[in-house]
Curated annotation (Swiss-Prot):
GO terms for cellular component: cytoplasm. Pathway: Cell wall biogenesis; peptidoglycan biosynthesis. GO terms for biological process: cell division; cell wall organization; peptidoglycan biosynthetic process; regulation of cell shape. This is UDP-N-acetylmuramate--L-alanine ligase. InterPro entries: Mur-like_cat_sf, Mur_ligase_C, Mur_ligase_C_dom_sf, Mur_ligase_cen, Mur_ligase_N, MurCDEF_pg_biosynth, UDP-N-AcMur_Ala_ligase_MurC. It catalyses: UDP-N-acetyl-alpha-D-muramate + L-alanine + ATP = UDP-N-acetyl-alpha-D-muramoyl-L-alanine + ADP + phosphate + H(+). Its EC number is 6.3.2.8. It comes from the Bacteria. One of its GO terms (molecular function) is UDP-N-acetylmuramate-L-alanine ligase activity. Cell wall formation. It comes from Shewanella sediminis (strain HAW-EB3). It is found in: Cytoplasm.
Length: 489
């Protein structure tokens, strides 16, 4: 028996297999959340297949691991499956879903399958409107540095691992908990993190913010009585909920009453430095290889979780300093020398006004001498409508703004909640003259005339703007360019 097989055998003695399940089929397998769970399952030894409308990096990776991937949804493809996994993005008339129901094959949500993976493990679930992916990644990195060998399922690419999911050989499972469809209520972790709570995905909660808050309380009460809730006390809504949580609480933040507190924050380009204060131990100096106060909060959450699990401080400090980032989370795609001077290209997934504001703040703090050029793609008409005034306020804070049309994500257009309307409203404020861009081709043709020496170019949004950012290669900009570095200053 090989060393890996021996580890797998030991894991099986801790984590029982799902009874009678051998073949698992994923409808929409190419999504980050679905693909991450699928990767863990295929590595656990299950026969795995699934479908999506197009090939992508996730489907290619799963195919390389032995999964059978179908492009397109056809009813016969679910034949032989013992269970079918779907996400809330799959419509009720999907032919594979209908066939599974007709054949009485069990159909479960993505979160139910994640809950099954977590059921026999020491689960750490990270919830919140913003910061889930980064916080989950930091926790996974700390546990990896401490040789706890965790399983993790993350909504973004963890650069150090080259994947967003990994099967470890220990009892630990670290995962994001999705509040967008309330599916995080399926999870029963040992540790729950709440980073912040804002009005987002309000259709799920019938437009009722109180219902959203009470759902977070229900999520925290899924913890066993011996579990731990790790909560950001800097967030006013989270602070408001603290008295309603009937579990052990560990708070974190910049606030003086935080159990895990950051002081003396300084940002130096991509790095964040701060003093860590916890009761009963000496203060420590910490360096996080991520920019911005919002990422210090994410690091504090990881520190709080690790401290509760008695992970050595040396491992925590090393993991945070060595952190290699996550795909599309303030990801520097390069520092380039052009015939107009050096420019920095950064790509970020944030698509809520608070997330965009945090990214802008980090960019200005780390590179105060640079002109900030943002290429923003709004995500969903409903979000643009519901947070319209906030978007106008936040997007007005950059030096130059190019607005791509809304990435619909399956929604129908909403009059007055599109990028042309945003352009008009921002222009009326008199601070900025934004440029509406109809598509990526027009963007690539416009940029050479817009950019100046020393610019920091920030592509921002949750749609296909990430793919567009990759297109902003040396030749695409129409300059005589040569890469000058790896991206980090």
């Amino acid at each position: 028996m090989s060393k890996n097989q021996e580890k797998y055998s030991q894991l099986r003695s801790i984590i029982p297999e799902m009874r009678r399940v051998k073949h698992i089929y994923f409808v929409g397998i190419g999504g980050a959340g679905m693909g991450g769970i699928a990767e863990v399952l295929v590595n656990e030894g299950y026969k795995l297949s699934g479908s999506d409308i197009a090939e992508n990096a996730v489907t290619q990776r799963l195919a390389s691991l032995g999964a059978k991937i179908h492009i397109g949804h056809r009813e016969e493809q679910v034949h032989g499956a013992d269970v079918v996994v779907v996400s809330t993005a799959i419509s009720a008339d999907n032919p594979e879903l209908l066939e599974a129901q007709a054949l009485r094959i069990p159909v479960v949500q993505r979160a139910e399958m994640l809950a099954e993976l977590m059921r026999y493990r020491h689960g750490v679930a990270v919830a919140g409107t913003h910061g889930k992916t980064t916080t989950t990644s930091l926790i996974a990195s700390v546990y990896g540095q401490a040789e706890r060998d965790p399983t993790f399922v993350i909504g973004g690419l963890l650069n150090s691992a080259g994947t967003n999911a990994r099967l470890g050989h220990s009892r630990y499972l670290i995962a994001e908990a999705d509040e967008s469809d309330a599916s995080f209520l399926h999870l029963q972790p040992m540790v729950s993190v709440v980073t912040n709570i804002e009005a987002d995905h309000m259709d799920t909660y019938e437009g009722d913010f109180e219902k959203l808050k009470s759902t977070f309380i229900d999520f925290l009460h899924n913890l066993p009585f011996y579990g731990v809730a790790v909560m950001c006390i800097d967030d006013p809504v989270v602070r408001e909920l603290l008295p309603k949580v009937g579990r052990k609480i560990v708070t974190y933040g910049f606030s003086e009453d935080a159990d895990v507190q950051a002081l003396n924050f300084v940002q130096e380009a991509y790095l964040s430095r701060f003093t860590l204060r916890r009761a009963g131990v000496e203060d420590m100096e910490v360096v996080v290889n991520l920019p911005g106060q919002h990422n210090v909060l994410n690091a504090l959450a990881a520190i709080a979780v690790a401290t509760e699990d008695e992970i050595d401080d040396a491992a925590i400090i090393q993991a945070l300093a060595d952190f290699q980032g996550i795909g599309r989370r303030f990801e520097q795609l390069g520092c380039f020398d052009t015939n107009k001077g050096e420019m920095v290209l950064v790509d970020d997934y944030g698509h809520h006004p608070s997330e965009v504001a945090a990214t802008i703040k980090a960019a200005k703090a780390g590179w105060p001498e640079k002109r900030l050029v943002m290429v923003y793609q709004p995500h969903r008409y409903s979000r643009t409508r519901d947070l319209y005034d906030d978007f106008v306020e936040v997007l007005s804070q950059v030096d130059c703004l190019l607005l791509l049309d809304v990435y619909a994500a399956g929604e129908s257009p909403v009059p007055g909640a599109d990028s042309r309307a945003l352009c008009r409203s921002i222009r009326q404020r008199g601070q900025l003259d934004p440029i509406f861009v109809s598509d990526s081709e027009q963007l690539l043709s416009l940029l050479p005339d817009v950019l100046q020496a020393g610019d920091l170019v920030l592509t921002q949004g949750a749609g296909n703007i990430g793919a567009i950012a990759k297109q902003l290669s040396l030749s695409s900009l129409g300059f005589d360019l040569a890469a000058s570095g790896t991206g980090k200053e």
